[in-house]
Amino acid sequence: MAEGQSPENSPPAPPPPSPPSPPSSNDQQTTSPPPSDNQETTSPPPPSSPDIAPPPQQQQESPPPPLPENSSDGSSSSSPPPPSDSSSQSQSPPPPSTSPPQQSDNNGNKGNNNENNKGNDGSSGDGGNKNMSHTPPPPSKTSDHSSHSQPRSLAPPTSNSGSNSSSNDGLNIGAVIGLVAAAGILFIVMILLCVCCFRKKKKKSKLDQMPYYGSNAYPAGKTGGDQYYNQNAATQQQQHYNQNDHIVNLPPPPGSMGTNWVSSPPPPPPGNWQPMPSPPAPVSGGANVIQSGEMSSNFSSGPYAPSLPPPHPSVALGFNNSTFTYEELASATQGFSKDRLLGQGGFGYVHKGILPNGKEIAVKSLKAGSGQGEREFQAEVEIISRVHHRHLVSLVGYCSNAGGQRLLVYEFLPNDTLEFHLHGKSGTVMDWPTRLKIALGSAKGLAYLHEDCHPKIIHRDIKASNILLDHNFEAKVADFGLAKLSQDNNTHVSTRVMGTFGYLAPEYASSGKLTEKSDVFSFGVMLLELITGRGPVDLSGDMEDSLVDWARPLCMRVAQDGEYGELVDPFLEHQYEPYEMARMVACAAAAVRHSGRRRPKMSQIVRTLEGDASLDDLDDGVKPKQSSSGGEGSSDYEMGTYGAEMRKFRKVTLESRDYGASSEYGATSEYGLDPSSSSSEEMHIGGSTSKTTTTNRGI
């Protein structure tokens, strides 16, 4: 223990024991301390590493105390290193005095071991200083180097092991952090995907309820009118079609044949249910086109957003379930009262109705007893189930029962028809931007029917009174009662001629060959109405001139000199963009070409109206020649030909009606309470004036 305490007072103690040897040993040891210091300086890294690592090394060096015996037995160079190391360390107290912190850092046990080794080395060193006076230095150096090389060799592994462990820990921590971060990112991505899917489903449900409009004013739900509109949505989904105000000849609710409505036993509705003779009775079973003109888009239903109790439990999602009872529709229209009458025609009447949930609808009642009406009812429902477009009027539901009652329920459009604003008594002049918007919207709806539906759909009755307007004056094509399906591989469909005078394509009126170009011609006539403000026929001249015959040379003149004065509606007062007017005039002139092959597609007209195509694209390689009168000169067309053909066709149809060849011929009152005469022939029957759209509807 005295020796254990001597390290603190080690500087004075060493000189007395062996004055001669210390110098030599010290000299030799003095040379050794620097390396030892250097070795120690290299050894600090182990201490810097975990403090536990160095002690085991010292403890591993402490067990070799038997090594001194080996050193005493022989002065082998291999054995001395441990004792010499211990001796060098035992004789290095003075240097340790300068570096006690290092040894204190290494542990107190090391100093104690050095002191114990010092005593052993002292006894052995005293006996062998003379003999080993010169030899020890080399061994001591070698021993020092070897001894220190061992710790050096040991130290790096410990430091490496520490660094490896620390690096492993770092890698483990980094891996854990990476996994956590990846899991967090994956979780966030999954949440975002769920949110997106939810929004898409929500939007889809809204679109399903009101497929044509992005804004559905009615909350989706199964309460109140929501079920009703879900029916509509499902109806439109299954129908994939915006149901237009389609007039389908099907036995109307109460009425048998004839114009008078027979009071229907079923309806106990609120208003007095009376026969419908009140509306002006159409002439002998006339093929009057009932245009549910006010079929409103979903936009028009905005004010009725609050949901109310459903109209009837039978009203549920899906077209098959979007059926109404006759009592429900009679109640919605106040017993089909005259106050709710929107229009009448050869196939029945159109009334405005309000469902219990506040939704406004247009109810078309079809007359009973007509096989043609039944077929057209089925055709309209079939076609409506195939289409889905925001510029086509949508069908809400229908009523069909064993009593022969056939009713179609459409969305209600508040702004009536294009005909009403152009030729009716609206009291306002439609400005040019609105006219252009209506032309473009109806062109898109018609292009969808021709080019996006398979098989394609030919409307057969495009006219101003079948273009319905929502509260934003967005156009909706209506009335698919005459529409025909045409396979893509069919060049044309041979069918009975149906339509309205002034809009019929010449090849269709003369031969009954129906193609999508027949609709293009009718659309061209409607464009001329928007441009000129005139009707399709000139009633003042007893149909001597049609709008097509009158406007064609003016359109050609506009193309030459750019003068619109005679052609453009004077009520516009030059408030229009010349380049927009030029595009519409070019589209109209190309659409009413006498030859169907030379007319453009509806998609070409859409692009031209939007300004995405040049006017030359409408010609599609066709360069019309100029006649001396300024009209289009071609081998199959001469001035006045269209009007002459229409007069001939009218005569044939009127004669067939007079002889009773078809019960479907007759007078028509265009949609609306104040129908105009633009697309109808003025006829005086029994002292009363009614308008006839001589639609040839064969049995």
Curated annotation (Swiss-Prot):
Residues 1-172 are extracellular. One of its GO terms (molecular function) is protein serine/threonine kinase activity. It is a single-pass membrane protein. Mostly expressed in flower buds. It is an enzyme of class 2 (transferase). Its main location: membrane. Residues 336-615 form the Protein kinase domain. It is found in: Cell membrane. This is Proline-rich receptor-like protein kinase PERK7. It comes from Arabidopsis thaliana. The gene is PERK7.
